[in-house]
Amino acid sequence: MTTRKRPLALLILDGWGYRENTQKNAVFHANTPVLDQLNAKYPNSLISGSGIDVGLPDGQMGNSEVGHINIGSGRIVYQELTRISKAIDDGEFDTNPALTKAIDDAIEVNGAVHIMGLLSPGGVHSHQDHIEAMCRLAVKRGAKKVYLHAFLDGRDTPPRSAKPGLAHFEELFKSLGTGQVASVIGRYYAMDRDNRWDRVSQAYELITEGKSLHQSATAVDAIEAAYTRDENDEFVGSTVIPDAQGNIAKLVDNDALIFMNFRADRARQITRSFVDADFDGFERAVTPKINFVMLTEYAANIKAAIAYPSSDLVNTLGETLQDRDLTQLRISETEKYAHVTFFFNGGKEEPFKGEDRILIQSPKVATYDLQPEMSSTELTDKLVAAIESTEYDVIICNYPNGDMVGHTGNFDAAVKACEAVDTCIGRVVEALEKVGGECLITADHGNAEQMTDESTGQAHTAHTSELIPLIYVGRDAEIENGGRLSDLAPTMLTLMGQDVPEEMTGRSIIKLKE
């Protein structure tokens, strides 16, 4: 006979921060009777999900990858942004074997060094300082043909903020005496993670064939033309920028292609289009034989050189539950599925023993303000059924709405997104109460609580560094102040009566009352 389990659920409300200022604060203005009631009835606090508390530079906004790694590992994990910036500062970057080999091999056959990545100071998927270091390294080692394919942000940065960065790189190449910004395209196309291959194909064709919707004389001209077309950075259509002789840079056999994004989830699809022999996402007109370098490991089954391999995280929450013969469920929509699985497990693709996964398809809409509830009802249907089954000791669930709709900059839609999640939380808590379960309700970082940039008046589409909520719906308890995301796994294990592995340096911040 199967033992009925009383699950402990962790509900992660993605992009749901706390902000004192109520202006254009979608979290504040949303009608959220369920969460209001839970806050009034149960222990709650605010915890940190940004900066040094999650292994990022001081003041750097958190993000979903970082948040889930810190939650799942139960320790502060120093992030790739910090790690690579330090390597550049120390000079180690200039001797990195994967990078130097790709450059040198291209030079040896008179090939080109192509560099692609999100040209942004956002620090979420990449940093333009890293891209500059890569351009300088290629020229320093003797490359005569250096081509930068710039993916534009406007999501982790203000919607129209790419121009200064593009101007800087044009001046950089002039000062270096070689190299050019060869193409620009919005991240909406180049960095899709939801199998919308029609978008990715536009970036692939731009880089391999020089095929584009637009052509401009300079990168600055390209962004100005995009703004004239009313395209924000994220949505800039494919634009090729010929050199002074009118030549268009195309990726060909024996060239190097170095991808300077350090975050995996939005780097995987376009990487596979370049390196997978059996790729079938779209029809590729050309498949050049190139030396491809991933800045970090985007997936274990992608066959390409890695400049900075992942460090192994052991005794994460998922692994600990496995080792103690406890069952666990991970559930989310497509947009955040990798976060509750791959990232939560410390960068491991394969499920642990006793770990089940449920993926709910995110709606196929151009932007999520068109459907702010996303697939939350279907997600909650599956989650409630899993709770009622009493099969799981631990359930990890992510509701993407606050983040995905927050990124659109649409305040009214973000309010609706928060309201949809609140309704779902009510159903989940009711199901848990019926089976004697408990839950922690928290977030991974802020977003929807700030929908306008107060300094510019533009829509605010980026994450924030605000504190995030934590509610314990369970026994009589107190929550200590000063908590961080890395405290959640030790707290969960303690609530379950389990010992905390020594690798988890977070602390249990919920103290049960006698």
From Swiss-Prot:
* Residues holding substrate: 125, 155-156, 187, 193, 263-266, 336
SUPFAM superfamilies for the chain:
2,3-Bisphosphoglycerate-independent phosphoglycerate mutase, substrate-binding domain (SSF64158), Alkaline phosphatase-like (SSF53649)
Record-level Gene Ontology MF annotations? manganese ion binding; phosphoglycerate mutase activity
Amino acids binding Mn(2+) 2: 14, 64, 444-445
Q: Where is the active site?
A: 64
Record keywords, A-Z: Glycolysis, Isomerase, Manganese, Metal-binding
What Gene Ontology cellular component terms go with this record? cytosol
- EC number of the protein: 5.4.2.12
Q: In which pathway does it act?
A: Carbohydrate degradation; glycolysis; pyruvate from D-glyceraldehyde 3-phosphate: step 3/5
Q: What is an example of a Pfam family matching this protein?
A: iPGM_N
Tell me the residue numbers annotated for binding Mn(2+) 1: 403, 407, 463
| Reaction it catalyzes | (2R)-2-phosphoglycerate = (2R)-3-phosphoglycerate
Q: How is the cofactor bound?
A: Binds 2 manganese ions per subunit.
Which GO biological-process labels does this protein carry?
Answer: glucose catabolic process; glycolytic process
Which cysteine residues pair off into disulfide bonds? none
Q: Which cofactor does it need?
A: Mn(2+)
Cross-referenced PANTHER family: 2,3-BISPHOSPHOGLYCERATE-INDEPENDENT PHOSPHOGLYCERATE MUTASE
Q: How does it assemble?
A: Monomer.
**According to its UniProt entry, what is the function of this protein?**
Catalyzes the interconversion of 2-phosphoglycerate and 3-phosphoglycerate.
Q: Hey, which family's this protein in?
A: Belongs to the BPG-independent phosphoglycerate mutase family.
Name the chain's protein. Answer: 2,3-bisphosphoglycerate-independent phosphoglycerate mutase
Q: Which organism is it from?
A: Shewanella pealeana (strain ATCC 700345 / ANG-SQ1)
Gene assigned in the entry: gpmI
